[in-house]
A protein has these predicted regions:
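Gly/Pro/Ser/Thr-rich low-complexity, intrinsically disordered segments predominantly at protein N-termini
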Residues: 1-158
Length: 158
């Protein structure tokens, strides 16, 4: 299945799950809790308030070598949007991709997503756990603080 088919299929609209495609085009569903949604909203608000030369977005679809993955939140510089605008899915990752861990996520799955986003051009990946604690990653591995958002909190209060 292709991402455009997922978007056009009426049976796949308004599901209470996040949809991604694996490398074989199979649909992968991930249920999200209200806590997940609240963390997503708080992070997106922080991104909008703290960087003026780009845009924040949620549910950001990115084509990767392992299928279409959907970052819970993302931020792209103006240059990213000048190149890609609203292409769906993006063929390159925005500057920052953020995953919010759900109980159904395995550690290996999150590690794979970090690597996939970075290999598609993300400069940073943030991983937020269910309690709001954030870890920051670049292609060099885990870093102490965000380089893109130096004032990023290490914990999202909700």
């Amino acid at each position: 299945m292709k991402w455009s088919q997922v978007l056009e299929d009426p049976a796949l609209q308004n599901l209470p799950y996040k949809i991604e495609l694996n490398e074989w085009g199979n649909i992968v569903l991930s249920p999200a809790s209200n806590k997940h949604g609240l963390l997503q909203a708080e992070i997106s608000w922080f991104l909008r308030q703290n960087k003026k030369n780009g845009k924040a977005l949620t549910e950001c679809s990115i084509n990767t070598s392992k299928g279409v993955k959907v970052a819970d939140a993302a931020w792209g510089a103006d240059d990213f949007f000048n190149r890609n605008y609203l292409e769906t899915p993006y063929q390159e990752a925005p500057d920052l991709c953020i995953e919010i861990i759900s109980p159904s996520n395995a550690a290996q799955e999150i590690e794979e997503k970090i690597n996939l986003y970075l290999s598609q051009g993300a400069r940073e990946v943030w991983v937020c756990d269910e309690e709001g604690f954030i870890k920051f990653y670049t292609s060099q591995g885990e870093i102490e603080a965000s380089q893109l958002f130096p004032n990023a909190p290490k914990k999202i209060e909700y």
